[in-house]
Amino acid sequence: HEKDYEKESEIFEKEDYIDWKYFIYFYEDKPIAFTELKVFDNSHVLTGQFAWDYAEPKLGIGTYATLYEIDWSIKNKYNKYYLSYGYEETSIYKSKYDGFEFWNGNSWIDNKSLYKELCKQDTNIKTLSQLNKYQRRYFKINNG
């Protein structure tokens, strides 16, 4: 934050060029979670962010939200539902859903084992040098 640039940064933050939609989830009449999503070309849905309050982990609100949104996408005749970005071990759960695919840099693939391994490797990267080595190895694997 630089002094005297507050007005520009406030304007920048207010101008969101993506027309996000929101699903808000309630428990006992209180909002406890939300998903931010975007519909592209009236045919594909991309979730951008999911957040919840962690007060009732046994509710499984993340799984509930994902299944609800997939069902909503099907009922609204969207072709694809993209469950946001995938990286690090925290994203492995995304591969449990039927029809799972991920972008490998060249094409969409459904290799869940490779996806899980890539997520685990992401978690272990701590330096730019490690990232560079990882990227070289990754693209060598995917480009033959």
Model-derived features with residue positions:
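Terminal substrate-recognition subdomain of acyl/acetyltransferases
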Residues: 83-144
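Conserved GNAT acetyl-CoA-binding A-motif
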Residues: 73-84
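Conserved acetyl-CoA-binding loop-helix of GNAT-fold acetyltransferases
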Residues: 58-71
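A conserved beta-strand-loop-helix scaffold within acyl/acetyltransferase catalytic domains
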Residues: 1-58, 88
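Short basic/hydrophobic patches in alpha-helices and adjacent helix-turn junctions
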Residues: 68-75, 96
